[in-house]
UniProtKB/Swiss-Prot annotation:
Biased composition (Low complexity): 178-192
CDD domains in the record: UBX_UBXN2
Name under which the protein is recorded: UBX domain-containing protein 2
Domain annotation SEP: ranges: 89-153
Organism encoding this protein: Caenorhabditis elegans
Amino acid sequence: MSRNIRTFRDIGNNDDGGPDSDDSGADAAERGAPQEFYAGSGQAVQGPRGAAARGPDSEAHIRRILQAAEVVQPEGGEAPRGRPSGRETISLTLHLWSDGLSIEDGPLMSRQDPRTIEFLESVGKGEIPPSLVQQYPGKEIDFKVNRHHEEYVAPKMKPFGGSGVRLGNVVPTVLGQSSSSATTAGTSSATTDHNPDHTAENEAKQLEDAKKELSTNMNEPTTNIQIRLPNNQRLVGIFNHSHTLEAVRTFICTARPDMIYAPFQMMAAYPPKPFEDESQTLKDANVLNSVVAVKILPTTN
């Protein structure tokens, strides 16, 4: 008789110490097989191989994800998979670091941040977090877990190759500033909200971190992009023409980590038009030396 696939909803019934919470998962990990789980709405979670999956971890939510990343093989055959069909599938990886977590090549998310806990709670309920639903509308998501034993290392951006033509000074008020004054323009107008960490000093540091991670190649054509946030704050970044709109999204989330948890849409400022394909280069999207507006999208329960 075939055994059943463990789902995220089973966690609520088989929490720590439950009758079925350890045996089969431990057996699968001892065999060294990758543990994989497909949740509803096209979501999947895959745990690491072998004993690393059972390593100590202080965060209960991390343990729950690893416990959920379990498929019990039926006797004499492969386990059935609850993967929907008929839609394009996107594979994403949740990286667990010793000092936090990240999604794909995105910025570090602190495990102590309540919004990170909420993000993981969505995963633990078998739901795709709203920010991912917005970023990949109408697509199935294979969500995998990859555990690391070292601290987070920011990856270098890998812009698409290709050539471009330098354009004129379309936004003179932005391009006429020095690099230091441009940084000040992006931070001095910041308004302090309920989060005490949102000081001008911290925001300036976060913006500099975002610029470093962007790894702009100054030997290739460059463009200044001014990003207008929902609170009317402005960020200024120097991009290559071959950078994509996805790189702009990563830049925003690194410069303002709050945006990691807020589903948002990037739009051309004038005429107002949302960008449907974020894999486009800035040159192809016709936003060189331009303004990109950020619009927060409503979340759905």
